[in-house]
């Protein structure tokens, strides 16, 4: 009788372990820099990754009608072309740090999610500030 209970518990634990760890490997999303990706392109081809770096100045092209954003992401050493379908975040600009989630396909990173890195410091407007002063403060923070 004890043997059947022990065997049942082991089967249940084995099944739970397989579901947890088996699914974990398929759902991992790696964070890479352009240099790390270019060192091992085959490993990450058609796999979901997060690519982090800076938007290279002079490379941003945005088609407002089609909602297509193209730019080059760099880590100062390597560069990767990025395509993102959708409206860019409000703080998106050249030279800005970004993280793009997506997949590499045919040499271009196809972004599905675009996040802008920004300072974690928050300074609320002081009483009596004019809208122009608040706008200037926001622009300086970016």
Swiss-Prot record:
What ranges are annotated Periplasmic (topological domains)? 24-142
Question: What are the BP-aspect GO terms?
Answer: cytochrome complex assembly
Entry's InterPro entries?
A: CcmE, CcmE-like_sf, NA-bd_OB-fold
- NCBIfam families the UniProt entry points to: PRK13254.1-1
Q: Which residues lie on this side of the membrane: Cytoplasmic?
A: 1-2
* Record protein name field: Cytochrome c-type biogenesis protein CcmE
Annotated TM spans: 3-23
Please provide an example of a Pfam family that matches this protein in its UniProt record: CcmE
Which amino acids does the record list as binding heme? 118, 122
Q: Which PANTHER family match?
A: CYTOCHROME C-TYPE BIOGENESIS PROTEIN CCME HOMOLOG, MITOCHONDRIAL
Protein's job: Heme chaperone required for the biogenesis of c-type cytochromes. Transiently binds heme delivered by CcmC and transfers the heme to apo-cytochromes in a process facilitated by CcmF and CcmH.
Q: Which family does it belong to?
A: Belongs to the CcmE/CycJ family.
Alphabetized UniProt keyword annotations: Cell inner membrane, Cell membrane, Cytochrome c-type biogenesis, Heme, Iron, Membrane, Metal-binding, Signal-anchor, Transmembrane, Transmembrane helix
Q: Where in the cell is it found?
A: Cell inner membrane
Q: Which domain of life is it from?
A: Bacteria
> Which GO terms fall under molecular function for this chain's record?
heme binding; metal ion binding
């Amino acid at each position: 009788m004890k043997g059947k209970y022990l065997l049942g518990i082991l089967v249940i634990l084995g099944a739970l372990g397989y579901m947890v760890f088996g699914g974990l490997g398929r759902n991992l999303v790696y964070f890479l820099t352009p240099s790390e990706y270019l060192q091992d392109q085959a490993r990450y081809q058609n796999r979901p990754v997060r690519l982090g770096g800076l938007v290279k100045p002079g490379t941003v092209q945005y088609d407002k009608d089609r909602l297509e954003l193209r730019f080059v992401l760099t880590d100062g050493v390597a560069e990767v072309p990025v395509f993102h379908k959708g409206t860019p975040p409000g703080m998106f600009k050249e030279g800005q740090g970004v993280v793009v989630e997506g997949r590499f396909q045919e040499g271009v990173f196809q972004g599905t999610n675009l996040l802008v890195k920004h300072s974690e410091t928050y300074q609320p407007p002081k009483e009596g500030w004019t809208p122009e002063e608040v706008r200037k403060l926001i622009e300086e923070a970016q």
